[in-house]
Amino acid sequence: MDWSKVYSYCERGGDPSFWAEPLNAISNGAFTIAGLIGAWQLIRSPRKDHALFEWLLVVLVIAIGIGSFMFHTYATVWAIPFDTIPISLFMLAYLGYALRRFAGAPWIIVIAALVGFYLTVRYAQGIQCSNELLPMTRGAGKRCFNGTLGYTPAFAALVLVGGVLLVQGHRAAGYLFAAAFLFLAAMTFRTIDLEVCTWTIRAGRGVGTHFLWHTLNGLLLYVLLLGAIRHGAPRDALPKAR
């Protein structure tokens, strides 16, 4: 187990203690709240199917909150998978869900899209900064866009799948577009966390903007859950028109 500390966010600075990132840690409650409200609405849903996949999405949202809380408190290398794995699983699961349940794509298309998405994310995560890019992307020991580039394929997927659903006239399209808007705002706050650190000093410590990344993501995941709960029933489980 690697106990090396990770100092990647403004709020932590160089403090190795458990509660060095109080806002970053507590704001993960947004994911737990989103998951619990989603579970409550799923229980109350009039759907006739068993909604097993929707329950998986709910569990993954709650797991994201728990894993991210662990990472922003322990802030060690061993805690990184607890933060990243639930996020990765949710992105893959929801993309497959949206393509299959919402868009009605055949399995071969769904599988190909998931493989392509995974490879695109891996590529985006490996993009190296150069000093010729925007100021916030300069090398100087910083991750490119503060590590946010790895999430851009997810934003693109929301927009593209939302566009397909819009053309199909599917009511879930609006949920994906709303989530894309929230995600764009969230990625912005994640990107500028270190850039604005000196402007957000309170009580002698930097606050940053990473907690807004959590808060907005909690809201967008709730929007995605709501779209799945309301409009994700299999076509043969939909009420018959009379």
Positions of PLM-derived features:
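Multi-pass alpha-helical transmembrane bundles in non-GPCR membrane proteins
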Residues: 1-242
